[in-house]
Amino acid sequence: MYPAHLLVLLTVCVSLLEASSIPARPLNLYQFGNMIQCANHGRRPTLAYADYGCYCGAGGSGTPVDELDRCCKAHDDCYGEAGKKGCYPTLTLYSWQCIEKTPTCNSKTGCERSVCDCDATAAKCFAKAPYNKKNYNIDTEKRCQ
């Protein structure tokens, strides 16, 4: 399939999604995942962070279980602050580069910059924090009160 055809198909799909009652999927998760891979040099799959501790993944409550979980809570809080400014963090696309294994935001202003900064800071934090396998897929009802 030609790139132009893919662009048209993507445009139609996004238009249909916006017109439907189906809630939109987070569009920037792909970018955030790539930032994580940039920062951790591909040492750990992005999905390893999707269900970690009390804050990595959807939602979050209680006390973070470790340093990595604190990174996720800080990321959630950063998205919350961006939301207070009228941004939609999970839907905001931004410009960034991986420079010497460091996520670097190119977006200069507004929601794009705010959300990019949230994601870049979290990706760098993830790369520095130890990953404890026993905190993956924990029972959040018991451990995150």
Curated annotation (Swiss-Prot):
Keywords: Calcium, Disulfide bond, Hydrolase, Lipid degradation, Lipid metabolism, Metal-binding, Secreted, Signal
Subcellular localization: Secreted
Record text on cofactor binding: Binds 1 Ca(2+) ion.
Catalytic activity annotation: a 1,2-diacyl-sn-glycero-3-phosphocholine + H2O = a 1-acyl-sn-glycero-3-phosphocholine + a fatty acid + H(+)
Propeptide: 20-27
Protein name in UniProt: Basic phospholipase A2 notechis 11'2
Residues holding Ca(2+): Y55, G57, G59, D76
Stretch forming the signal peptide: 1-19
GO CC annotation, single: extracellular region
Top enzyme category: hydrolase
Highest taxon above the source species: Eukaryota
Any single GO BP term: lipid catabolic process
Coiled-coil boundaries: none
Intrachain disulfide bonds: C38-C98, C54-C144, C56-C72, C71-C125, C78-C118, C87-C111, C105-C116
Expression tissues: Expressed by the venom gland.
InterPro entries: PLipase_A2, PLipase_A2_Asp_AS, PLipase_A2_dom, PLipase_A2_dom_sf, PLipase_A2_His_AS
Main location: secreted
The protein's role, per its UniProt record: Snake venom phospholipase A2 (PLA2) that has no lethal activity. PLA2 catalyzes the calcium-dependent hydrolysis of the 2-acyl groups in 3-sn-phosphoglycerides.
Active-site residues from the entry: H75, D119
Known EC number: 3.1.1.4
GO molecular function: calcium ion binding; calcium-dependent phospholipase A2 activity; phospholipid binding
